[in-house]
């Protein structure tokens, strides 16, 4: 081979710039790509970042093509060497350098700066020179495949890949026919991408006949390209400075000096580039990649919910009764198709989680010397318990185009979007004892039939021998005033006379329609005195109302403490209303027109209605107010003093709303005596089983109206208060009656007792 051709190749590759230029790609243009040993190529500082094959691979991988198949043939090759560099003695036989290059070296001087090296040498001539290369050409067919799409199209991705391999192997035999069939598959499925390339030396007479510089380099498994640093042709006093300048240019983009100390290397930034240690582009790419990974994580869960296996599982779930988390778990474990699909999801999310962790570690590693603090949160894996709760929400909280989250403890939905239209009718619970045997066909929320020993009563199952109509002879629990909550609220706003309970106002500290000082606690009581006046009734409270007037320009609000005695008795035998706790309502304040008076209303409704005989109300200021020495708050009110006037309020009206229930004390006392007698005779329950069932029903219905308590604490025992104050039983008699009922409930009916707390 003549010297001119070698010289041409020499100048072509020695002075060809193999350097890194700043990348201007958008973050969307790259994605996670090659194996771990090539991860450094994602940086703009990688020497092959702009190579054609690398960019093509990244672009195809971003489009979802994960497999590359390439078939090629070489049609010529020969190896050339840079004989000028192979000379051992560069002092006696210097390398024949271009005059421009020699002039650039002389311009550097004896002690050039890093920036001088970059501007004079590196930006013009690069950092490496070519030692040897293999020239030639190839004809190739490259095919990128997306196995997931092939799997969906054909049902078996392995067979599809083998068929494509066989088709591509006939490329060099029947090129036109093979390409036509491959293009048809590419258009119809979108699962493959086919590229033809013909590169190589087309003629040796001139460089213009070559496709590109890289086209003459064969890309095979052997190492075909050998480079060496450009410092070997520099004078010795410039070699170290050139290496330092080249590293600063490659690793710091020419924006600082690359220094290493104590095994830690970093860029010492110039004043005009204070953020040179922070690869903003790489960080943005990784943040964008992490955001896409988080979206893919969410999409993986949606794909499972939209899969045929999950939909068929939802269709097979029984809809004729309520499904608890445990029963859904049992159906979940018995569905083998869903289990295999769920295992695929787990393996996919585990692989995705590892990718996210690797990328996040790289992101935080790159951000060590940045002012930019990355904000990334690892997506949480949905546990099996969360999947079961999700299934429950899809069953019962997916109605009218709205959706929500189901709360099994409350058997209700929390709808999203500030609406209550997402809840479907919640089916009844099927089980043993007093649970339903079957739900009603007319109303799935109610029982349709009951288990043996129980009977259906108003949509629920009760012990068979209990006659609820007979209980009404003792206490008329159900009246014509059992309104719905919305009706009750409307009637209370209108002050309907049907809900008035005529009580007696008692107070030594307050007089109605008279101003008083709120800096001291005030007490008043509303009582019925049923033991003297209305012995044939017990009374139910469903709300309270109070009209409070203030002085002008006063914003003083009272704070209420309300104690209720359910069946008379001392103050210690009452319970405190827990306003705003455990779902208990609060006072509502409404101002009356053209006045300084307000209506304070408390609506208990059907949920929190309860028995009452006396209501004790304590009032005090909500905020701590200044008091004057030697004042007791009992003297006459001086409204002329402007400093005191703001502390005065008056109550013009106070009213309890509710209704009365008929109460047959004599009949109930005879039933209690029968229970007491059966207990004293050694537990002869069978002879009086109807009475025992009747008293159990009455006790349950009375204690059901007890006030709310904190979770885990026992309910208050109102039944014992009724026995003590309305039937006048002694404490020993009350203990015997309750013990007899508990024994019958546990030993005969085989039901668990509900713990209660003593009130009276």
Swiss-Prot record:
Function, as annotated, reads: Plays a role in neurogenesis and brain development. May suppress cell cycle progression in postmitotic neurons by inhibiting G1/S transition.
SMART domains in alphabetical order: MACPF (SM00457)
Protein source organism: Rattus norvegicus (Rat)
Q: Give the chief site where it resides.
A: cytoplasm
Outline the extent of the MACPF domain: 68-251
Localisation per UniProt entry = Cytoplasm
Q: What is this protein called?
A: BMP/retinoic acid-inducible neural-specific protein 1
Q: What cellular-component terms does GO give this entry?
A: cytoplasm; dendrite; glutamatergic synapse; neuronal cell body; synapse
């Amino acid at each position: 081979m003549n010297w001119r051709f070698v010289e041409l190749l020499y100048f072509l590759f020695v002075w060809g710039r193999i350097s890194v230029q700043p990348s201007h790609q958008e973050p969307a243009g790259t994605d996670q790509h090659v194996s771990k040993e090539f991860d450094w190529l994602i940086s703009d500082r990688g020497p092959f970042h702009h190579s054609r094959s690398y960019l093509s691979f990244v672009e195809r991988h971003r489009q979802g093509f994960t497999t590359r198949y390439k078939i090629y043939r070489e049609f010529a090759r020969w190896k050339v060497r840079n004989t000028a560099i192979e000379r051992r003695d560069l002092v006696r036989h210097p390398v024949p350098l271009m005059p421009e290059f020699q002039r650039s070296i002389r311009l550097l001087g004896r002690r050039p700066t890093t920036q001088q090296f970059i501007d004079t040498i590196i930006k013009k001539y690069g950092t490496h020179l070519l030692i040897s290369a293999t020239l030639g050409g190839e004809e190739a067919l490259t095919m990128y495949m997306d196995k997931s799409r092939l799997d969906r199209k054909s049902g078996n991705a392995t067979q599809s890949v083998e068929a494509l391999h066989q088709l591509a192997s006939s490329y060099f035999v029947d090129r036109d026919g093979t390409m036509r069939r491959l293009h048809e598959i590419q258009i119809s499925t979108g699962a493959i991408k086919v590229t033809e390339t013909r590169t190589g030396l087309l003629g040796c007479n001139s460089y213009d006949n070559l496709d590109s510089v890289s086209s003459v380099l064969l890309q095979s498994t052997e190492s075909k390209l050998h480079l060496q640093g450009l410092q070997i042709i520099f004078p010795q006093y410039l070699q170290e400075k050139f290496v330092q300048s080249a590293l600063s240019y490659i690793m710091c983009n020419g924006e600082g000096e690359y220094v290493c100390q104590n095994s830690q290397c970093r860029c010492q930034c110039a004043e005009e580039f204070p953020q040179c240690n922070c690869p903003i582009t790489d960080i943005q790419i990784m943040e964008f990649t992490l955001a896409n990974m988080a979206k893919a994580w969410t999409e993986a869960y949606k794909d499972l919910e939209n899969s045929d296996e999950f939909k068929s599982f939802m269709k097979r779930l029984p809809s004729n009764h309520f499904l608890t988390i445990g029963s859904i778990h049992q159906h979940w474990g018995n569905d083998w198709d869903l289990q295999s699909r769920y295992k695929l999801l787990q393996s996919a999310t585990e692989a995705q989680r590892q990718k996210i962790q690797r990328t996040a570690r790289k992101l935080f590693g790159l951000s060590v010397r940045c002012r930019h603090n990355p904000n990334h949160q690892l997506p949480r894996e949905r546990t099996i318990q969360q999947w079961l709760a999700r299934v429950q929400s899809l069953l019962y909280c997916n109605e009218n185009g709205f959706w929500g989250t189901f709360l099994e403890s409350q058997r209700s939905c929390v709808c999203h979007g500030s609406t209550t239209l997402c809840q479907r009718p919640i089916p009844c619970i099927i089980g043993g004892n007093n649970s339903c045997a079957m739900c009603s066909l007319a109303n799935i929320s109610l029982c349709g039939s009951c288990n043996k020993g129980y009977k259906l009563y108003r949509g629920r199952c009760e012990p068979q021998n209990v006659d609820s109509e007979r209980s009404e002879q003792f206490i008329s629990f159900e009246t014509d005033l059992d309104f719905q909550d919305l009706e009750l609220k409307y009637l209370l706003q209108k002050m309907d006379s049907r809900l008035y309970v005529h009580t007696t106002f008692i107070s030594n500290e307050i007089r109605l329609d008279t101003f008083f000082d709120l800096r001291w606690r005030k007490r008043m009581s509303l009582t019925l005195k049923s033991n003297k006046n209305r012995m044939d009734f017990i009374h139910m409270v469903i709300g309270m109302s109070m009209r409070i007037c203030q002085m002008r320009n006063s914003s003083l609000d009272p704070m209420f403490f309300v104690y209720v005695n359910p069946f008379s008795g001392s103050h210690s035998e009452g319970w405190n209303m827990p306003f705003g706790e455990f779902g208990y309502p609060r006072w509502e304040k409404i101002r009356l027109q053209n006045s300084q008076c307000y209506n304070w209303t408390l609506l208990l409704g059907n949920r929190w209605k309860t028995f009452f005989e006396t209501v004790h109300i304590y009032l005090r200021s909500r905020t701590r107010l200044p008091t004057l020495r030697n004042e007791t708050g009992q003297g006459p009110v001086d409204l002329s003093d402007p400093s005191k006037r703001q502390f005065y309020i008056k109550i013009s009206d106070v009213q309890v709303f509710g209704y009365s229930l008929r109460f047959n004390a004599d009949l109930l006392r005879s039933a209690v005596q029968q229970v007491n007698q059966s207990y004293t005779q050694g537990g002869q329950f069978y002879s009086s089983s109807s009475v025992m069932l009747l008293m159990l029903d009455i006790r349950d219905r009375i204690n059901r109206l007890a006030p709310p308590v904190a979770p885990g604490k026992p309910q208050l025992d109102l039944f014992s208060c009724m026995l003590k104050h309305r039937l006048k039983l002694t404490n020993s008699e009350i203990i015997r009656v309750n013990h007899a009922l508990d024994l019958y409930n546990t030993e005969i009916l085989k039901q668990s007792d509900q713990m209660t707390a003593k009130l009276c």
